[in-house]
A protein has these predicted regions:
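Short linker/helix segments within small regulatory modules
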Residues: 20-30
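Short functional micro-motifs and their immediate structural scaffolds
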Residues: 15-19, 41
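Conserved beta-strand -> loop -> alpha-helix junction used to position metal-binding or nucleic-acid-contacting
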Residues: 152-201
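A broadly conserved sequence feature marking short terminus-proximal activation segments
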Residues: 1-8
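Short, amphipathic alpha-helical "recognition" segments used to contact nucleic acids or chromatin
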Residues: 47-63
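RNase H-like nuclease fold core
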Residues: 2, 28, 32, 39, ...
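Short cysteine-rich clusters marking metal-coordination/redox-active sites
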Residues: 10-13, 33
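Acidic/histidine-rich catalytic cores and adjacent linkers
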Residues: 30, 37, 41-52, 148-151, ...
Length: 393
């Protein structure tokens, strides 16, 4: 049976009757018109653009350098320049979560990236110059109020939680509490009171039930009974040589607590115990409502999100400020709950080239650097001119 003639039309002469004529060196099918002899390759810009964006995002969120892509840097930059205009955005689902972890990580160019995470998935992010109440409020208002929020205790975060999620219970990250105690007592304390405080901090992070929590609270009370008077010891300025006065003492301050670090460490544990923010994850009423286990730390966020973002920026060190931010946003988007394929985010305006920068207008007045002298009388009286001769020699 004879083969049916091709209905594909030639883009040159417009006649039907085009047949396949091998492949190009890149593997694309080559077509040849049986009427005019023109040869061409069919193109699908939409598919090509999706493939370019997929390759671009894989490079941007991966470890490979441009040299590993088997293409010159100029070709890669020209081909993927439009990809920087695609903005990944996490669309809120409205789901109410059992818990949300919030924290910020500092990146180059003075930026701080706040993230909200559940089960290792990024729910939202917010750029800011530092962690503060306003930035955290912008982050929290995109998400419905959860049962519990885990935070490292940053003041701006706690204030924003109180305003945006007034009914949400707060869980202080126990690992951050331990780190704060370690900073005050050191990891190998010599003073007996410091040893006791460091022991309480180490015991805090391994508590798994209410019985252990009750025992720990009893140990904190026992520490106060034993060391309470010692913590209240005071040092008076008139009894200390001037060179031994601590640098942080105000000029009009007449006394201070002798054991400042031990006192701060104890107050940290005692205050958080009174506020009931250390063992929120063990609350029976919350665990009855929750469908998953409630964590006591932000380790999941610190290790899986913040550390990975810093590693990403390090692997692509040298990116400009907007490109650095776009790389972090793409990484967060790909690690959200329901990310679309990058090619599905392409919009027509992404493919249009941006406006070219206009020519800079010269500032009015004489030039500061030039190749000749301006003899315009508006700018000089004529005394400035090129000197010739031997200048008296």
């Amino acid at each position: 049976m004879a083969r049916k003639p091709s209905r594909r039309k030639c883009p040159t002469c417009g006649e039907a009757g085009v047949k396949k004529n091998g492949r190009t060196s890149k593997g694309a099918i080559r077509y040849r018109c049986t009427h005019c002899g023109a040869s061409y390759c069919a193109s699908r810009p939409d598919i090509s653009r999706k493939a370019e964006l997929d390759q671009f995002v894989n490079w941007l969120t991966g470890k490979n350098a441009i040299g590993d892509l088997q293409v010159s840097s100029s070709t890669w930059q020209r081909r993927t320049n439009w990809c920087w205009r695609v903005d990944p955005v996490i669309v809120p689902t409205g789901q109410i979560y059992d818990y949300i972890q919030i924290d910020g990580t500092y990146l180059p160019y003075g930026w701080c990236l706040l993230t909200a995470v559940n089960s290792g998935k990024v729910l939202a992010w917010q750029w800011c110059n530092q962690e503060n109440k306003a930035a955290y409020k912008q982050l929290l208002k995109r998400l419905p109020e959860p049962l519990m929020v885990i935070t490292d205790g940053q003041a701006g975060a706690l204030s924003a939680i109180k305003d945006q999620w007034p009914n949400t219970r707060v869980q202080r990250c126990l690992v951050h509490i331990k780190r704060n105690i370690r900073t005050l007592t050191t990891i190998n304390p010599k003073i007996p009171a410091h040893k006791a405080l460091w022991g309480l901090a180490k015991r805090l992070v391994v508590i798994e039930d209410l019985n252990q929590a009750d025992q720990w609270v009893g140990l904190v009370q026992a520490f106060h009974d034993q060391w309470g008077k010692w913590l209240n010891h005071k040092t008076y300025k008139n009894q200390v040589p001037p060179e031994q006065v601590p640098f942080w003492i105000r000029p009009n301050q007449q006394w201070w607590y002798t054991h400042q670090k031990a006192r701060r460490a104890y107050n940290l544990l005692a205050n958080q115990t009174r506020k009931a923010t250390l063992f929120t994850f063990l609350d029976p009423s919350l665990n009855k409502q929750a469908t998953t286990a409630l964590p006591a730390t932000t380790n999941e966020l610190e290790g899986a999100i913040n550390a990975a973002l810093k590693a990403l920026i390090y692997n692509h060190r040298g990116l400009s400020e907007p490109h650095m931010k776009k790389a972090a946003q793409w990484w967060c988007y790909l690690h959200s709950e329901h990310p679309l394929k990058p090619g599905q985010l392409i919009q027509p305006h992404h493919l249009k080239p941006g406006p070219k920068p206009g020519a800079k207008q010269a500032k009015p007045g004489p030039k500061l650097w030039d190749s000749a002298i301006d003899y315009d009388p508006k700018y000089q009286d004529g005394s400035l001119h090129i000197r010739k001769g031997w200048a008296g020699h």
